[in-house]
Curated annotation (Swiss-Prot):
Source organism: Staphylococcus saprophyticus subsp. saprophyticus (strain ATCC 15305 / DSM 20229 / NCIMB 8711 / NCTC 7292 / S-41)
Highest rank taxon of the organism: Bacteria
Alphabetized HAMAP family for the sequence: UPF0346
NCBIfam families for the chain: PRK13672.1 (NF010193)
InterPro entries reported in the protein's UniProt record: UPF0346, YozE_SAM-like, YozE_SAM-like_sf
Pfam families reported in the protein's UniProt record: YozE_SAM_like
Family label: Belongs to the UPF0346 family.
Name of the featured protein: UPF0346 protein SSP1318
Matches recorded under Gene3D superfamilies: YozE SAM-like
Length: 73
């Protein structure tokens, strides 16, 4: 089982030609993003209130779901 932060996983989505790739780029460009965080609620709250993200929160939900699956392997 992996023990990486969501930020680390999001970097693997950079370069995708979909909304998840766009979100990953926005996360990468956000210097204040909580890079060591794993908790869904803390990350979701940050994206909703602190970040300046143009992507729908449902895209974050989907990417976080991929993250939880990725951690299992």
């Amino acid at each position: 089982m992996k023990d990486h932060s969501f930020y680390h996983f999001a970097l693997t989505a950079r370069g995708r030609k979909d909304e998840k790739g766009e979100l990953a780029e926005e996360i990468f460009d956000d210097l204040s993003f909580p890079k060591h965080e794993k908790d869904f609620h803390i990350l979701s709250d940050y994206i909703e209130t602190q970040g300046h993200y143009t992507i729908s929160l449902s895209v974050f939900d989907d990417l976080y779901e991929e993250y939880t699956e990725w951690l299992k392997f």
